[in-house]
Amino acid sequence: MALYCVGDIQGCDDAFERLLATIGFSPSRDALYVLGDLVNRGPDSAAVLRRCITLGDSVRPLLGNHDLHLLAAAYGTRRPSRRDTLQGILLAPDRDEMLEWLRHQPLARRVHHGGGDLLMVHAGVLPQWTAEETLAYAGEVEAVLQSREFAGFLQQMYGNSPDLWSPELQGTDRLRVIVNALTRMRFCSPEGRMDFESTESASEAPPGLVPWFDAPGRRTLNTLIAFGHWSTLGWLDRADVLGLDTGCVWGGCLSAVRFGTTLADRERYHVECPQAQMPGA
């Protein structure tokens, strides 16, 4: 079995199809982990979801901020913005099947491969969290999303406060911090206070902030973390982190990594993407 991770697809189904062909993906033999943001901004989000559903258990996605936004828009708790390209899902005859499938995906995954652990999230992991805590906290949100109370949670999910984790947090505040860390965070303070304003590259960190993966004392330092979300960061391949959002929807490329016999043995694949959105438009 070959193990792959792929970055943000964001509704670019043609690029997704070409990438699957490039890697020679076999649903009966391989596993493909999609690091969130399957939908939105690209031309055919519905086709991406249908393709993933058709490929069955061989495709194992995470929820990203755009996927949560789709759920909120679909269930009436968030108005679509003018830049959204979600109508193909919202008006589709199989919309309920796609939304239910998406709602039951996790916010974090971990896989043991070649003697090591790979932790996968869409955006980031707070420096205070261990890998085990990350999975447990993600599970708290997943339990609510997959319950009958999910619509109420989606209505209360949005907001930038609190921006600092405490294990004493409860209720909506606790779940919001977890969601924001896993699906929105790029920069944080050295003590883990999240910033939601800057979308610049890691080398242009605002004063007093660092990329989340460079926070001092990060407790997941010895676990390889694969993530997406940060298109201005681009491809990042370090011993401890692997960033795979290479800006497909912005005219960059859609990237995947194939792991060999160990997590350190990895190879990048990518396909070029036509520009579907103009930054700042």
Swiss-Prot record:
Reaction equation(s) it catalyzes: P(1),P(4)-bis(5'-adenosyl) tetraphosphate + H2O = 2 ADP + 2 H(+)
Keywords on record: Hydrolase
InterPro entries referenced in this protein's UniProt entry, alphabetically: ApaH, Calcineurin-like_PHP_ApaH, Metallo-depent_PP-like
UniProt entry tagged with the keyword Transmembrane helix: no
Family, as annotated: Belongs to the Ap4A hydrolase family.
Task performed by this protein: Hydrolyzes diadenosine 5',5'''-P1,P4-tetraphosphate to yield ADP.
Protein name: Bis(5'-nucleosyl)-tetraphosphatase, symmetrical
The organism of origin for this protein: Acidovorax sp. (strain JS42)
